[in-house]
C-alpha cells in the first residue's frame, strides 16, 4: 500500500474507533482463529511458523479488545478435532500454547490490567507439562476481575454437551437431582465452565462461514461475523469492522 493509502487507512481506522466507542460493544467476544496453515502456505513458510504468527496476532487482538472496552474474550485455541492432526504438529501446538501461557505469567500487562486467564475444555489428554502450566496461570490470575481471557483447549461443543448429560444422568441415579428439575439454568451448571456467559459476537477468520463445534450451547443467539482474511493477516481495521457490524444489528434472541 502506498504512503497515501496508509495515511487514508489510518484516518479511517481512527474515525471508526471513535464511532465504536460511542456505542455498546460486545461484553463477550468469541474468536475462531482459522487460517494459520493457509496463511503459511500462501507466503511460503512452514505451517509451524504460521502458528507462531497466529500466536503473535492473538496478542494484538487482545490489546484491541481491551482498547474498545470488551471485557471477555474466548478463543478457540485447540479443538477435539485437532487431536487428529499429525503428531509433530500437535506437539508443536502444545509447546506453543505452553509458551503463550508462560508469556502471560511474565507479562506485566496481565497484572496491570487485571486479566484473568481461564481454560475451558477436557484437558485430560493434554501433556502433563501443559496441564501444570495451565494450573499455574489460572491460579496466578484467579483474583483478577477487569478482563477475562478464556482459551478453549481440548474443546468440542458436542463433547461438552455429552459430558454434561453424563454428569446429569449420574446425579439423577444418585438421587441428587430430579428429572423435573432440569432446565436451561441447571444444564448450564454442568458445562465445563458454568460462569461463562453466552458470547455476544463470534468472529471467525479465513472466510469460512461456520462455527465448527465452538460453544454450541452458548452460541444459540450469538451474532456471527466472518472476516475474509486468514487469522495472522487480520488487521485492526478488520477487527473494528466486526465490532461496528455488531453495533448496527438488532439482536432478537429468537423473538
From Swiss-Prot:
Gene3D superfamilies in the cross-refs: Decaprenyl diphosphate synthase-like
Give the reaction(s) catalysed.
geranylgeranyl diphosphate + 7 isopentenyl diphosphate = tri-trans,hepta-cis-undecaprenyl diphosphate + 7 diphosphate
- Recorded protein name is Tritrans,polycis-undecaprenyl-diphosphate synthase (geranylgeranyl-diphosphate specific)
Q: Which cofactor does it need?
A: Mg(2+)
Indicate the residues that form the catalytic site: 34, 82 (proton acceptor)
Top-level lineage group: Archaea
UniProt lineage: Archaea, Methanobacteriati, Thermoplasmatota, Thermoplasmata, Thermoplasmatales
Pfam families per record = Prenyltransf (PF01255)
What top-tier enzyme class does this entry carry? transferase
The record's HAMAP family line, in alphabetical order, gives: ISPT
The GO terms this record gives for MF are: ditrans,polycis-polyprenyl diphosphate synthase [(2E,6E)-farnesyl diphosphate specific] activity; magnesium ion binding
User: Subunit structure, per the record?
Assistant: Homodimer.
Keyword Transferase found: yes
Q: Can you quote the record's cofactor note?
A: Binds 2 magnesium ions per subunit.
Purpose: Catalyzes the sequential condensation of isopentenyl diphosphate (IPP) with geranylgeranyl diphosphate (GGPP) to yield (2Z,6Z,10Z,14Z,18Z,22Z,26Z,30E,34E,38E)-undecaprenyl diphosphate (tritrans,heptacis-UPP). It is probably the precursor of glycosyl carrier lipids.
* InterPro entries, per the entry: UPP_synth-like, UPP_synth-like_CS, UPP_synth-like_sf
